[in-house]
Structures are given as structure tokens and as C-alpha cells.
Swiss-Prot record:
The protein's name in its UniProt record: Probable dual-specificity RNA methyltransferase RlmN
Organism: Clostridium botulinum (strain Langeland / NCTC 10281 / Type F)
Tagged with keyword S-adenosyl-L-methionine: yes
Family of this protein: Belongs to the radical SAM superfamily. RlmN family.
Record: residues binding [4Fe-4S] cluster: 111, 115, 118
Length: 342
């Protein structure tokens, strides 16, 4: 059986026609799934009995089961652990803002990139998620909170560009007016910096925001923090970023997790300013998430602000990320790992 969420409307139409069914039934089915959030074919009232049976025999609506749901004390952040049909568990985070609800979705079960500050990579990657499985996190979360989600961040467990085919199909699906109709400009994809895939993504001409996990302006330190830096130098990464900017005319966000005594000095800030000066970019400074498997400590707020001021003085737009959901282990990989290791 196949997950119907992996299908575009046109693909489902073609399948129905091949079974001597009416093509317009595809739109009716999509309406039940994506607008009414009905995930059982038998509850789709305007679908004929024969067609329901045909669909039930060949497809399932692959929305994951909620195995854990946590809400922060301020009620602005929800953390979900979702279980798929094969028993694999991933996590998603919903953040409520004045401008709408945003979800951080996972693209893989685990991750193989090995970034030292990330809990989701500690056990490696188990498998890729399909386009429909990524999409289903949004649908399951919408059903749970009873509100529409309008912004998507691909920044949960997994490296999106390590699952390129499924992630790009997800982007095509989620932005379609036949499914969730989320605008491309409301989507951010975060990558540790797989250079060839950044260029390939640029060639797709999406209007999404690309976020690069940078974390150091120096190759030696970046190699220590992020194994991907052993494959691609900062020079190569910046060339790929320039290609992306020139191709899409979209501003890139550079993410920089500040670790006390590691990458938070004024010297590092000045070096980063040199690397990024003149680029169409924005820097998001992040207090690092502390995990017991490494000795990384958060930089002080004073250091973070001083670091940011250096960047601003050099004409680089900079913000400090607001911490949300710390009381519910909302940072990437933390809750899933504590759950599956029980």
C-alpha cells in the first residue's frame, strides 16, 4: 500500500483513470484530506462506496500517531513526538506568533551530519522521510492545535539537502493550492552546507528562504564543530551562497550558534563580518542548546549582544533568536532522544 500524501493531485487523477474511475474524484479526496482533515476514506461522504474500497485497498493516509505532546508554560510552543507506520519516531515543534503559527519539521529519522551541538545526530540516520511524511507533520499538528499553520521551517531532525528528492517534492506539494497552499516565502530550509545541493536548489528557482548553519568563519573551528566542513571549505560554501543569491535574488540567513569561549569572541565577530560583508544576507545569532553529550555552554547574553553589535557596525543585519520552548526540550532532537532511549 502507498501513502496517498506522497501523490500530487495529477498523479492521483492518473491513477484513478487507470482504474477506470472518474478523475474528478481526486479533487474530492484531496478536499477531505487537506481541507477537512479527514484521514479515513470511509468517512468521505461524497465518495462512492466502490471508490472508497478501491482507495482503501491501495492507499493509506499516512498521518503519524501522536505519542507525546508537550506545551510550554507560556502556551506559545508545542512539541510533538510523531510515530510513523513502521514505528519510527520523529519530532516537530509548533511556535505561535502574532503573525501566525510556524512549524519546524523533520526531514529524516535521525541525521548523519554529526554536528557537535545537535542532539538529533547522536545516533546517526535511520532513514529518509518521504515527501508525504514531511507534509503529514503539518497536518497532524494542525489537527492537534485546531489552527492553521502558515509558516514552515525545515530545521528539525535531519539534513534536508541530504534528502533532496523527497524534500523538493515536499516543497512542490506543500505550496500547491490543491493541498496546504503555504506560500513559498513562508518556508525556510536550513542546511549545514552541502555545496552541490545548494546550487541544485538554486536552479529550482524556489522563493523560499535558505538558512545556512555556519557557526564559525574559520575552517579549522568549523571542522571541529561540523564534520561537513571537512568536505567543503568556507570559501566553497560562500561561492555556493553567492550562486544561490544571484540565481534567486533571495536573501540568505546565516545561523550562528554561540558557544562560550569557543566561537563568541570579538575576533570571531570581526572575521565573520569580513566573510559576509556585502552579501545579501541576515545573521541569526543563537544561544547554543546545551546537551549532556558535549561540553558546549551557552555564551552570555552580554557576549552575544557584543558579537551582534560588531556585525551591525559592518552593515550586516543581525538578530538574536528568541528562545522558545526551553522548558519542554523544544530544541532539535532533544525530546525524541530522551524518549527512544528509555
Amino acid at each position: 500500500m502507498e501513502n496517498i500524501l506522497d501523490f500530487t493531485l495529477e498523479e492521483l487523477k492518473e491513477w484513478l483513470i487507470s482504474k477506470e474511475e472518474k478523475a474528478f474524484r481526486a479533487k474530492q479526496v484531496f478536499d477531505w484530506i487537506y481541507n477537512k482533515l479527514i484521514f479515513d476514506f470511509n468517512n468521505m461522504k461524497n465518495i462512492p462506496y466502490k471508490t472508497k474500497n478501491l482507495l482503501s485497498d491501495n492507499f493509506y493516509v499516512g498521518v503519524p500517531k501522536v505519542v507525546k505532546k508537550l506545551m510550554s508554560q507560556d502556551k506559545n510552543t508545542y512539541k510533538f513526538l510523531f510515530e510513523y507506520k513502521d514505528g519510527n519516531i520523529i519530532e516537530s515543534v509548533v511556535m505561535k506568533y502574532k503573525h501566525g503559527n510556524s512549524i519546524c519539521v523533520s526531514t529524516q529519522v535521525g541525521c548523519r551530519m554529526g554536528c557537535k551541538f545537535c542532539a538529533s545526530t547522536l545516533d546517526g540516520v535511520i532513514r529518509n522521510l518521504t515527501s508525504g511524511e514531511i507534509l503529514s507533520q503539518i497536518m497532524a499538528a494542525q489537527k492537534e492545535i485546531g489552527e492553521r499553520i502558515s509558516n514552515v521551517v525545515l530545521m528539525g531532525s535531519g539534513e534536508p539537502l541530504d534528502n533532496f528528492q523527497n524534500v523538493t517534492k515536499f516543497l512542490d506539494l506543500v505550496t500547491s493550492d490543491t493541498t496546504l497552499n503555504i506560500g513559498q516565502r513562508h518556508i525556510t530550509l536550513s542546511t549545514c552546507g552541502i555545496v552541490p545541493k545548494i546550487k541544485e536548489l538554486a536552479d529550482k528557482n524556489y522563493n523560499i528562504t535558505l538558512a545556512i548553519s555556519l557557526h564559525s568563519p574559520e575552517d579549522l573551528l568549523r571542522k571541529e564543530m561540523m564534520p561537513i566542513a571537512n568536505k567543503y571549505s568556507i570559501k566553497e560554501l560562500m561561492e555556493a551562497c553567492d550562486y544561490y543569491i544571484n540565481k534567486t535574488n533571495r536573501r540568505i540567513t546565516f545561523e550562528y550558534a554561540l558557544v562560550k569561549g569557543k566561537n563568541d569572541s570579538i575576533k570571531e565577530a570581526k572575521k565573520l563580518s569580513t566573510v559576509l560583508k556585502g552579501k545579501l544576507c541576515h545573521v541569526n545569532l543563537i544561544p547554543v542548546n546545551e546537551i549532556k553529550e558535549n561540553s558546549y555552554e551557552k555564551s552570555t547574553l552580554k557576549n552575544i549582544e557584543s558579537f551582534g553589535n560588531i556585525l551591525k557596525e559592518n552593515g550586516i543585519e543581525t538578530t538574536i533568536r528568541r528562545e522558545m520552548g526551553a522548558d519542554i526540550n523544544a530544541a532539535c532532537g532533544q525530546l525524541r532522544r530522551s524518549y527512544v532511549s528509555k
